[in-house]
Amino acid sequence: MKDFEQPARTVPVREVDVVVAGGGTAGVVAALAAAQQGANTALVEWKGYTGGLVTEGGTALHSFFNLWKAFPGVEKRQVVKGIPQEIIGRLEKVGGTSGHAEMLQGYDYDSVCTAVDTELYKLVTLTMLEEAGVELMLNTVLADAIVESGTVKGVLTESHAGREAIFAKAFVDSTGYGDLCARAGADFTEPNDQAVANSMGVAKVSVEGYHELMAANDAVKDDCEGRRSGEPG
């Protein structure tokens, strides 16, 4: 492959207190936490919406709201609240989640699974970010890190508006891939490939019958049952 030397150019600059790279759930919570403490915060996300794997992967929130099943003898109680629980609470108000449901099988890394409506999740998190005054930079790619003497001073972004430099006092890498850290020169290891997995949603079927069929063929690895429509919380 040939190399191309890009000519030097001047780009617009903005300054904030905190830059959060990645708008998945971790990035949303980090940006909200910073903004709610009074920090001028910018959230950079390359998709046109927030939510990351929860919204595009159909994974629900394997949320670590508690891990009592993975550690026998640990008290059964909710240990994570704060902003994550605020998101769930607001989703419940608009019918966007069935709430925390206890894992019945496959609880080696969580004890509850929180299924969400992906479109309402996008709406709720975007609304919360706007309410907190976070500068949303959607459809924006993290192109590079600006590093001086081993310290990240800023980032270069690319969007439909062109390239931009953002300088800040603090940076959070919530890309899921360590993109900001890698661009800044941090060591990293290429992960092993993960098998492709698909999620699906179905309606007007017998959940019990489907589960019985899967269980009879030893095809159930994880099992969690949320509230049905109309059931009390």
Specify the residue positions occupied by each region the protein language model found.
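N-terminal Rossmann-like FAD-binding beta1-loop-alpha1 element of flavoenzymes
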Residues: 18-42
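Core beta-strand elements of the Rossmann-like FAD/NAD(P) dinucleotide-binding domain
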Residues: 14-16, 161-170
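Rossmann-like dinucleotide-binding core of oxidoreductases
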Residues: 66, 178-233
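Conserved N-terminal/central alpha/beta ligand/cofactor-binding core
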Residues: 7, 33, 39-40, 45-144, ...
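Short hydrophobic core segments
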Residues: 21, 166-176
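Extreme N-terminal leader/targeting segments of oxidoreductases
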Residues: 1-18
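Glycine-rich, N-terminal phosphate-binding loop of Rossmann-like dinucleotide-binding domains
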Residues: 23, 159, 175-176, 184
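Conserved beta-strand-loop-beta-strand element in the redox core of flavoprotein oxidoreductases
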Residues: 146-165
